[in-house]
Regions:
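Non-globular targeting/processing and membrane-anchoring segments
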Residues: 24-290, 404-412
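Short acidic, S/G/P-rich loop/turn micro-motifs used as interaction or catalytic elements
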Residues: 196-199, 304-309, 337-340, 386, ...
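Short active-site neighborhood of thiol/selenol oxidoreductases, capturing the structured segment around
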Residues: 286-313
């Protein structure tokens, strides 16, 4: 959908000058050869250019060849091309199979190398003896991703749960887990992480915890595994455990987790938000009730990682009337996963004091949200959605915002 961000859309940065780097040695006949990587003179900006590169480049000369066949296919399938070039991609497989240096080189193919700088990628290259053979769970993982991609709206979580129950839950026993090969053990961990991220269900976190312990037993934990487990613990509000994990795995480059406190009784299932304590530098989130049944209000699903959300906030703040209406009747809310982005949320609130951003405690805080896209404006009358405005195009969306405000009698 144009002008919205789903998850983390990656928009490309500047092109670094081309260079030649040695490929991995190939001692097939007793001679080590340094093959020069084939790097295009300019970034690949279309599917046609990518197809030409793949056609004309021997696999051994391409950094794409550093990926296992399945990872390469998933990465290339994730590339989204826009009018002016590449507009989005998934870095999941790159994180789990390559180091930052390798990711940087590979992303130079597309002019997107800057995204490797702080990526939670491997700290050391996979050993040459690493078994790249696809196990039984890699195909199951592909089907899990397909279930997530093809599900409509609020059915995504259900589709993921069904796929996970059929193909991964049977492997979540100690005996089955121990019997898996290393790659399948990693895919089991990644599947549990995806299911927990999509649904927030505690059963998936329990699976993830056991899978992480299995990877520890095999001495297979590196930065991507520890980073994903850390973030899952924070989303599950286990800040003490996340803090302990950081101490055990300093390769996880995160700031200390905020303390999470609740000073009022909030019953299970009641909508609530995490709020950054204003006027203090304490790393603390406080949980408050969130009344979605107020007579008239605007709930804005936004993200600190979405420049469309920032543009919307800028344009609304530039209009004195809208700024005051949103200050009194608006609530900007980030998805539950942004509990991992404490510093970014605090910076947003300092930059937009009239449009302060809270973090949804869980999915129940925003029952009207079927699929996480940002920004989305929900105009509510006593909890009923009367109008919805999706996205923030280059020309803004202020007219649509005014129409929505009129429908809930906040603007004449």
């Amino acid at each position: 959908m144009p002008y919205t961000t789903m998850g983390r859309l990656l928009f490309l940065l500047a092109l670094a000058p081309p260079f030649a780097a040695p490929a991995a040695p190939t001692p097939d006949d007793g001679v080590t050869r340094n093959l020069t990587l084939a790097m295009p003179a300019k970034p690949i900006t279309s599917r046609a250019e990518l197809n030409a590169y793949l056609r004309d480049t021997p696999p051994a000369n391409s950094p794409l060849n550093w990926l296992t066949p399945g990872a390469q296919r998933r990465f290339l399938d994730s590339l989204v091309y826009r009018e002016h070039g590449l507009g989005g991609m998934s870095l999941a497989d790159l994180r789990y199979e390559l180091t930052r240096k390798q990711v940087y080189t590979l992303l130079r193919l597309f002019g997107a190398q800057d995204y490797a700088v702080d990526l939670d990628a491997l700290t050391t290259p996979r050993p040459a003896t690493h078994d790249d053979t696809a196990g039984t769970l890699e195909a199951a993982y592909d089907r899990l991703l397909a279930a997530a991609e093809h599900a409509e709206g609020g059915a995504q979580g259900q589709a993921i749960s069904r796929s996970y129950a059929a193909e991964f839950a049977p492997a979540q026993t100690d005996a089955r887990r121990h019997a898996l090969g290393d790659r399948d053990a990693e895919f089991l961990f990644r599947a549990a992480e995806l299911a927990f991220r999509a649904t927030g269900q505690p059963g998936y976190l329990a699976d993830l915890r056991r899978d992480f312990a299995e990877l520890e037993r095999r001495h297979r934990v590196d930065r991507p595994h520890a980073s994903d487990f850390h973030d899952a613990l924070l989303v599950a509000h286990r800040d003490d455990e996340a803090r302990a994990l950081l101490a055990a795995y300093p390769v996880v480059e995160r700031s200390p987790p905020p303390s999470m406190r609740s000073f009022s009784r909030i019953r299970n299932g009641q909508p609530s938000l995490w709020v950054v304590t204003p006027g203090t530098r304490k790393r603390e989130l406080v949980r408050f009730r969130f009344n979605i049944r107020a007579p008239a209000q605007v709930i804005v699903l936004a993200s600190t990682a979405c420049h469309f959300s920032a543009n919307a906030a800028r344009d609304i703040e530039a209009d004195p009337l809208l700024r005051d209406l949103f200050r009194e009747y608006g609530q900007w809310v980030a998805p539950p996963s942004e509990v991992t982005a404490f510093d970014a949320v605090r910076e947003w609130n300092e930059a937009h004091p009239a449009l302060r951003l809270g973090i949804a405690y869980d999915n129940a805080a925003l029952p009207m949200v079927e699929r996480v896209e940002t920004p989305v404006f929900y105009f509510l009358d006593h909890g009923t959605v009367v109008d919805t405005v999706v996205g923030w195009p280059p020309g803004g969306n202020l007219d649509a915002i005014r129409r929505g405000l009129r429908k809930i009698d906040l603007l004449r």
